[in-house]
């Protein structure tokens, strides 16, 4: 009986020890922290002479939540006596350079969470007042195209800044108010977005902690092969966007509206008889244009200067220097480009109350532009019940645009840049997260598509009756400005983030290993599908089954659609050291820092009395446990001689 009692006691001790141990470290972490998955960090960008953006400390920054949602809470912050580290929660109206720099300079903060459950009540852009000024045609210009800008994007902060989605913002606002009311337990947050890059682009690249900002541009033609002897009409746009939080770069007016427009124009023209066209029409979507027009610059440089030293067996690719596609060299003659039409910001056409129509503006450069704009005016005026009219700009300089890259090489090409502004941007949120579907006029889209489709058909030599594909437009428009969950037939994968994001990202780990975001791949496949000239009877399940073509609806399809590197000419890849290097710092030198992962977690914080009570109770429990163990040990030793 005694032995049985001893055995039971030992089993109870073992059982208590086992149950006192955590099953896994993650269990404790999960019980303490709540991870917020819909969070979007500010990242760090390196330049040739410094850096801008944000980063947390290694392991993250944490602190108690402090809500600033009105002037009183903003002013009270500077007399806030809380001794603990602070994570500031900002209503979107207080997210600007003046407020944040004031907080940063006058107090120590561990990080910032920006709420998105409300809209800014004033126009705001964190970009510069003349985007890309030093890389354009007029580096000494005194114009300010973007008057609502404060340059906030280009400041550097030693703490993390996160935005969170609408639903999460409501929850964080509530628990932050809980803190402000002095209730316990209080709430804190941990922001982890450690960026490995430091100093500048040269140092960061040498250490292998950065990659060049860039991507891949896309160009396409209806012709199976462009006749190099024919004149070329180049219809183009910059399709990448920017925002303070890169994962929220919708850029509805900045680019997305124009991208939808041009894709819809191409869709309309795909259905017409093009046999009467006496000119080639090339459609181009330039990437990484917001970083010094590097997409268009790289393409032009390849057209004019590229020389392949070593080809592959069929001369379709170049091994040295590496180019995966040489169609640009075999099909496009730079001197044959006779007209450039660029769609820029066109999503906020201005209402002319006298005409009862919305106005878009024509910015021209080069020679003989009137012959082009006259045709556009004729098309627009002949379209009955049109809501759109076109006006000449009052400015002598072009707005920031990809056309500048071409005009640097020659001023003999007629260039027409179409925008929704005469001078100052009509876009109140350029480069900001609120440049979304609510910031553009979707009601003008059909008329713009019809007029531009007819216009391009006319200048190419056609005289077709245009019918726009409204169903295509109705699918594409919300997809590119609201939720990019469309066209699942074209894309086998699903976007990780449903918010459309046209940030160009980084180019890749080498010249032959490029990275293409979901949105770039989608535009490429859309273009490929629309401009296809041949569908074989070859069955396929993936692109791997289709050499030199792509797989659509179970069949291999051919198209004259191509990807082209969008990378600053200031970079080259050192194959001997397997690192990027800077070869010419006069070009844009933007690199993005590497990071392991990003996370935003919230947790509860007790008051000092509660914390002391937990400490004391823990010590009491420890002492009681030690006393119990010593007693049991002595009891077993004396009575049963077991210990």
Curated annotation (Swiss-Prot):
Q: Which residues lie on this side of the membrane: Extracellular?
A: 21-611
Ranges that cross the membrane? 612-632
Q: Which cysteines are joined by disulfide bonds?
A: 42-54, 204-210, 308-318, 479-486, 540-551, 546-556
PANTHER family given for it?
A: NICASTRIN
Q: Subcellular location, in the record's words?
A: Membrane
**What quaternary arrangement does the UniProt entry report?**
Component of the gamma-secretase complex, a complex composed of a presenilin homodimer, nicastrin, aph1 and pen2.
Q: Which domain of life is it from?
A: Eukaryota
Q: How does the UniProt record describe the way this protein sits in the membrane?
A: Single-pass type I membrane protein
Kindly state one GO CC term assigned in the UniProt record.
endoplasmic reticulum
UniProt KW Cytoplasm keyword: no
Originating organism: Dictyostelium purpureum
Q: Check the UniProt entry and state the signal peptide residues, or none.
A: 1-20
Q: SUPFAM superfamilies, from UniProt?
A: Zn-dependent exopeptidases (SSF53187)
What does the function comment of this entry state? Essential subunit of the gamma-secretase complex, an endoprotease complex that catalyzes the intramembrane cleavage of integral membrane proteins such as Notch receptors and APP (amyloid-beta precursor protein).
Ordered alphabetically, the record's keywords are:
Disulfide bond, Glycoprotein, Membrane, Notch signaling pathway, Signal, Transmembrane, Transmembrane helix
This one is known as Nicastrin
Homology family: Belongs to the nicastrin family.
Is Disulfide bond found in the keyword set? yes
Q: Which GO terms describe its biological process?
A: autophagy; macropinocytosis; Notch signaling pathway; phagocytosis; protein processing; sorocarp spore cell differentiation
Q: Which residues does the entry place in the Cytoplasmic compartment?
A: 633-643
In this protein, the residues bearing a glycan are 96, 166, 333, 385, 584
């Amino acid at each position: 009986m005694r032995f049985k009692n001893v055995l039971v006691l030992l089993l109870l001790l073992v059982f208590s020890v086992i149950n006192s141990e955590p099953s896994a470290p993650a269990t404790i972490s999960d019980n303490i922290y709540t991870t917020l998955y819909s969070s979007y960090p500010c990242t760090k960008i390196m330049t040739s002479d410094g850096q801008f953006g944000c980063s947390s400390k290694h392991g993250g920054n944490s602190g108690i939540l402090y809500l600033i949602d009105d002037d009183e809470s903003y002013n009270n912050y500077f007399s806030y006596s809380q001794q603990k580290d602070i994570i500031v929660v900002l209503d979107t109206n207080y997210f600007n350079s003046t407020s944040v720099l004031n907080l940063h300079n006058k107090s120590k903060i561990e990080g910032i969470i920006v709420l998105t459950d409300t809209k800014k009540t004033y126009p705001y852009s964190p970009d510069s007042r003349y985007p890309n000024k030093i890389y354009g045609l007029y580096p000494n210009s005194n114009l300010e195209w973007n008057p609502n800008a404060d340059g906030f994007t280009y400041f550097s902060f030693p703490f993390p800044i996160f935005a969170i989605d609408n639903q999460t913002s409501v929850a964080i606002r509530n628990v932050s108010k809980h803190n402000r009311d002095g209730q316990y337990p209080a709430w804190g947050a941990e922001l982890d977005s450690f960026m490995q890059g430091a100093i500048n682009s040269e140092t960061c690249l040498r250490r292998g902690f950065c990659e060049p900002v860039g991507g891949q541009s896309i160009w396409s033609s209806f012709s199976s092969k462009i006749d190099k002897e024919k004149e070329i009409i180049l219809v183009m746009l910059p399709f990448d966007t920017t925002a303070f939080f890169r994962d929220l770069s919708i850029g509805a007016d900045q680019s997305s509206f124009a991208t939808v427009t041009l894709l819809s124009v191409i869709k309309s023209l795909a259905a017409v008889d093009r046999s009467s066209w006496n000119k080639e029409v090339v459609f181009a979507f330039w990437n990484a244009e917001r970083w010094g027009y590097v997409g268009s610059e790289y393409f032009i440089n390849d057209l004019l200067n590229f020389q392949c030293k070593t080809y592959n067996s069929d001369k379709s690719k170049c091994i040295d220097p590496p180019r995966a596609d040489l169609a640009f060299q075999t099909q496009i003659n730079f001197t044959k480009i006779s007209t450039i039409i660029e769609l820029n910001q066109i999503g906020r056409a201005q209402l002319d109350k006298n005409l009862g129509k919305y106005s878009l503006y024509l910015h021209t450069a080069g020679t003989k532009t009137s012959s082009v704009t006259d045709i556009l005016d004729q098309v627009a005026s002949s379209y009955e019940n049109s809501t759109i009219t076109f006006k000449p700009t009052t400015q002598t300089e072009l707005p920031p645009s990809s056309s500048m890259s071409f005009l640097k090489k020659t001023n003999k090409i007629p260039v027409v840049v179409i925008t929704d502004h005469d001078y100052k941007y009509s876009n109140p949120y350029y480069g900001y997260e609120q440049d979304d579907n609510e910031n553009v006029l979707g009601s003008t889209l059909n008329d713009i598509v019809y007029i531009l489709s007819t216009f391009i058909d006319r200048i190419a030599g056609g005289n077709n009756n245009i019918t726009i594909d409204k169903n295509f437009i109705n699918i594409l428009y919300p997809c590119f400005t609201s939720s990019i969950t469309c066209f699942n037939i074209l894309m086998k994968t699903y976007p990780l983030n449903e918010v459309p994001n046209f940030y160009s990202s980084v180019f890749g780990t080498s010249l032959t290993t490029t990275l293409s975001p979901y949105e770039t791949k989608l535009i490429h496949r859309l273009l490929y599908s629309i401009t296809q000239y041949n569908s074989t009877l070859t069955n396929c399940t993936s692109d791997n089954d289709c050499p030199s073509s792509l797989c659509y609806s179970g069949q291999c399809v051919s198209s004259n659609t191509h990807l082209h590197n969008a990378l600053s000419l200031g970079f080259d890849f050192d194959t001997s050291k397997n690192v990027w290097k800077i070869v010419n710092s006069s070009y844009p030198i933007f690199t993005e820092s590497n990071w392991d992962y990003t996370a935003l977690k919230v947790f509860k914080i007790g008051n000092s009395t509660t914390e002391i009570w937990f400490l004391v109770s823990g010590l009491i429990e420890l002492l009681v446990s030690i006393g119990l163990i010593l007693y049991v040990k002595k009891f077993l030793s004396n009575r049963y001689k077991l210990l």
